[in-house]
Amino acid sequence: MKLDRILPFAKLLLEKAVQPGDITVDGTMGNGFDTVFLAGLTGEKGHVYSFDIQEDAIQITAAKLKAESMHERCTLVHDGHEQMNKYISKEHFGNITGAIFNLGYLPGGDKSIVTQANTTISAIEQLFEMMAPEGIIILVIYHGHPEGATERDALLHYVQDLPQQKAHVLKYDFINQSNNPPFIVAIEKR
């Protein structure tokens, strides 16, 4: 297939937005793959803030970062992404160039612990104010479970109402695939 699948396309967008030395956010740490990816993009002089409410996610991600010698450029936060204002250094406000949220539940974890539209929207609103112009927020929306469908609907309603003078919003999905495949919403600050 020549078209980029969902996760490679998300990474491509982040690679365009993030430069060495930049500040980034992983809003849903999960198994740490995005945190490690962002730490690679930001390099030794950059920084990644990564959030999750599950202790397992913190431990898994910390081990991956240590194995890659990237742990010193990351702040792992054991709290919800809706609390990011409390953790992101004020000196980084206006300097965040990329962020990603993989919404749903932790793969291999407790499927009853899922992201919620209200906390995700709160995080997006906070993050948008901290973003640099042309910074990109990526939402990877997994909606094949009831809570995911509810979150999808609320997020699509929210992003469709963002003023075009403030943001460009892209939806990237495969419309002829069955079983509710994930899709991307990308928000670029103008």
Regions found by a protein language model. Give the residues of each.
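S-adenosyl-L-methionine
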Residues: 1-23, 27, 33-36, 40, 58-95
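Helix-to-beta-strand junctions that scaffold the AdoMet/dcAdoMet cofactor pocket
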Residues: 19, 42-43, 131-133
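Conserved beta-strand signature within the Rossmann-like core of class I S-adenosyl-L-methionine
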Residues: 28, 130-141
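Conserved SAM-binding motif I beta-strand of class I
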Residues: 47-52
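Mobile active-site "lid"/loop adjacent to the S-adenosyl-L-methionine
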Residues: 101-122
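A short glycine-rich, Lys/Arg-flanked "PGG" loop and its adjoining helix->strand segment in the class I
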Residues: 119-133
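Class I S-adenosyl-L-methionine
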Residues: 149-190
